[in-house]
A protein has these predicted regions:
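A short, well-ordered alpha-helix in the C-terminal region of glycosyltransferases
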Residues: 327-339
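Donor-nucleotide binding loops and adjacent catalytic segments primarily
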Residues: 44-46, 173-179, 183-259, 292-295, ...
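Conserved nucleotide-sugar phosphate-binding/catalytic loop shared by glycosyltransferases and other
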Residues: 3-8, 30-76, 157, 308-310
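Active-site-proximal region of nucleotide-activated glycan assembly enzymes
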Residues: 35, 112-175, 180-183
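C-terminal alpha-helical cap of glycosyltransferases
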Residues: 321-324, 338-355
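An amphipathic, basic-hydrophobic alpha-helix
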Residues: 66-95, 113
């Protein structure tokens, strides 16, 4: 029995896919029987490094603006769908999970004349184009937010997160986390986390916060490409400002902080699962207004404050206000927290796949 997972492109698709793969293995599926497909981007590094079989496809995503490359897209998708069909036959695939993005469409098309069920997982409060299209013949769509617009046959389970966060205990990890980062015990800690697309702007926010000489420590995950320059600025700052390029033990980052300033992609599931209040700066990049939809959904519960990229001067005041309300905001995260999402999806896939 093989389960095929189509998750590619950005970390917002790749890491939830990996979380489901790890949950399947935890439930007894042999790792060689959890096969990932994608392009030659982040997924081509992440899945093999985690020990999973990975089969690259020659494909590309749709550009939202008029671009000559879009003219070739139908032929590219057809070729990729034929490649997926061969994988389905050669591997005796029992069920397929697509996590949106450009790889989901050829995977879904390959199933249209086969008795193999398709499941989808949507990471955002507003469904992406690929999942909206593929949901027309999916058995079920697992959503990260309740009442996700644009999808039929949806079931709210939450966004799959890493195993290290699914049983997160801040009080138990806090002393280890503070020692890990070298953080003093006498101040609150504000985490500033920039993803691959948002790092430059979030790093400017970290600089802005440091310039206010705050009564808190800044823990800045700057991204590998920005870490050296941020560390240089932090060394010259008069405020406590700790810089890391990347943190493999992400549970220690969340355990160390009292508040996160970050983007609002699918990673918001990590904020709610770890009961971390947030000041969210939604990005305007990518497909549609997904980050704004996510940010509004979290803010509606009282777990986050939201500010646009055009109003970054408001961030220090919002951080001050959020720290003063952090107990109430942390409690509000429970409204959306679904730390068992990866296991729930894995169990549903196994039930469908049968013995």
């Amino acid at each position: 029995m093989t389960i095929l997972i189509a998750a590619a492109g950005t970390g917002g698709h790749v890491f939830p896919g990996l979380a489901v793969g790890e949950a399947l293995v935890a439930l007894g599926v042999a790792q060689d029987n959890v096969v990932f497909i994608g392009g030659r981007r982040l997924e081509a590094e992440v899945y093999p490094a985690a020990g999973f079989p990975f089969i690259p496809l020659e494909l590309a995503g749709l550009k939202r603006r008029m671009a000559p490359s879009n003219l070739a897209l139908p032929a590219v998708v057809r070729r990729a769908a034929r490649a997926v069909a061969r994988i389905l036959d050669e591997r005796s695939v029992a069920t397929v999970l697509g996590l949106g993005g450009y790889v989901t469409v050829p995977a879904a098309l390959a199933l249209r004349r086969r008795p193999v069920p398709l499941y989808l997982a949507e990471q955002n409060a507003q469904a992406g184009l690929a999942n909206r299209f593929c949901s027309l013949w999916a058995e079920r769509v697992f959503t990260s937010f309740p009442h996700t617009a644009g999808l039929k046959r949806q079931e709210w389970v939450g966004n799959p997160i890493r195993e290290s966060l699914s049983a997160f205990d801040r009080s138990a990890l806090r002393p280890i986390a503070k020692q890990h980062f070298g953080i003093p015990d006498d101040q609150p800690v504000v985490g500033v986390m920039g993803g691959s697309l948002g790092a430059a702007l979030l790093n400017r926010v970290a600089q802005q916060l440091a310039n206010t000489k705050p009564a808190y420590t800044i823990l800045n995950l700057a991204g590998p490409a920005h870490a050296h320059e941020q560390a240089r600025l932090a060394a010259a700052a008069s405020s406590p400002w700790i810089v890391r390029g990347f943190e493999t033990r992400i549970e220690l980052f969340y355990a160390a902080i009292d508040l996160v300033v970050a983007r609002a992609g699918g990673v918001v599931a990590e904020y709610t699962a770890t009961a971390t209040p947030a000041v969210l700066i939604p990005g305007g990049f990518g497909s549609g207004e997904h980050q704004w939809a996510n940010a509004r959904a979290v803010a509606k519960t009282g777990a986050a404050m939201v500010v646009s990229e055009d109003e970054l001067e408001r961030v220090p005041a919002l951080v001050h206000d959020a720290l003063g309300q952090r107990a109430e905001m942390a409690a509000a995260t429970a409204t959306l927290a679904r730390p068992r999402a990866a296991l729930d999806i894995a169990e549903a896939l196994l039930k469908e796949a049968g013995p």
